[in-house]
Amino acid sequence: MEALFCSEIPNNNIRSSINDLSSSSSYTWPMIMTSSSSSSSSPTIMNIENIPRCDWDLSLSAVVSSASTGSDAIGAIEFDPTGEIIATGGIARKIRSYRLSSLLESRDDHVTASESYICTPAKLSSLKWRPDFSGRVIGSGDYDGVVTEYDVEKQVPVSERDEHGGRRIWSVDYTLYNGSLIGASGSDDGTVQMWDPRNGGTLEETVRPGGGAAICSVEFDPFGGSSIAVGCADRNAYVYDIRRLVDPLIVLDGHTKTVTYARFMDSHTIVTGSTDGSLKQWDIDNGRRVVRTYRGHVNSRNFVGLSVWRHGGLVVSGSENNQVFVYDKRWEEPVWVCGLGHTNRFGSDRRFVSSVCLRQVDEDWCTLVAGGSDGALEIFSGKQS
């Protein structure tokens, strides 16, 4: 089994071993405190607003096992702009697409449920739908350092960029800013490249925020602002203004290991993930202030995924113990934890959660998709309790 390993400090080598891992069933984090001064043995709720609680009744809704006989770790999961189509990519060199409504019709194993798939020339690390094609064109970043865009309906490539010198790409993203479409990619070569997808992928800007350290994550402000957040193997995250890329606006330097992800919760708040085993929420309007640090999941060497649900205020991370951890942005402890493992291809000691994605189009219904190092997808959904 091949995993998606993070670049490490100082020389960005790829780690070659996997921790012993174990899975467990779903549970919620302890939320009731016992008062030591109470004469009764009954639990007493103290400072209820400060006690983590899960406001969403999440449960398993569908499973998609991997039909592959080889390595099939899922490195990327993306909903299209409508929230109906799920695209996945990873080690198997395929972009698979699924229709969410079809998967939710039953809880049977949907091993053959893929609406379509596209074979790619290299292993994939990232996917992102182009916002100007209404879910028809998807961009991918691969291990050969190439960004390729595919027409999902026709299942053919429509453009290709090979500007990272053959160094693997870890992240791609797009934004529509003031009517202009901009693409970005981050790579092991230490650069973030931005280009015009409508003009043959013409390179517009290149920045090197970490002095040559690998770039693990790029994300534009999804609310239409001019910021881009960058996660870097030098242990920092950077925020740039795309109108002036000479220097970063902010350097977020609270992590002790590689920053694998940087996600916008809103235009003023960024959540970062790191192989130091923590997530951090940052107030970027007030310099580099850490609002909250989230701990509970296990992450020391792999890309495990990070997704935020902007409507519901949730932060979701995968984990190297094959569990999904859901945090409410208000509290540092997880409010919901669930072990994957409805397939047993490799045995529980070798699996971990390698990608997660939250559906963004709903406000009163939560849909969470988690992908594993065994190539399986599990979909959880639920309404507000």
Curated annotation (Swiss-Prot):
Protein name: WD repeat-containing protein RUP1
SMART domains: WD40
Miscellaneous comment: Overexpression of RUP1 confers an early flowering phenotype.
Phylogenetic classification of the source organism: Eukaryota, Viridiplantae, Streptophyta, Embryophyta, Tracheophyta
Pfam families according to UniProt: WD40
Subunit structure: Interacts with UVR8. Interacts directly with DHU1.
Keywords tagged on the record: Cytoplasm, Flowering, Nucleus, Repeat, WD repeat
InterPro entries: RUP1/2 (IPR044616), WD40/YVTN_repeat-like_dom_sf (IPR015943), WD40_repeat_dom_sf (IPR036322), WD40_rpt (IPR001680)
Induction: Circadian-regulation. Expression increases during the dark phase with a peak at the beginning of the light phase and then decreases to reach the lowest expression at the end of the light phase. Induced by UV-B.
BP terms from Gene Ontology: flower development; regulation of protein-containing complex assembly; response to far red light; response to red light; response to UV-B
Signal peptide region: none
Organism the protein comes from: Arabidopsis thaliana
Mutant lacking the gene: phenotype: No visible phenotype under normal growth conditions. The UV-B responsiveness of the double mutant dhu1-1 rup1-1 is similar to that of the single mutants dhu1-1 and rup1-1.
Subcellular location: Nucleus; Cytoplasm, Cytosol
Repeat region (WD), residues: 69-108, 119-160, 163-205, 210-250, 254-292, 298-337, 348-385
Function: Functions in association with RUP2 as repressor of UV-B-induced photomorphogenesis mediated by UVR8 and HY5, likely in coordination with DHU1. Plays a crucial negative feedback regulatory role downstream of UVR8-COP1 to inhibit UVR8 function, balance UV-B-specific responses and ensure normal plant growth. Is involved in the regulation of photoperiodic flowering and vegetative development.
UniProt GO cellular component terms: Cul4-RING E3 ubiquitin ligase complex; cytosol; nucleus
Domain of life of the source: Eukaryota
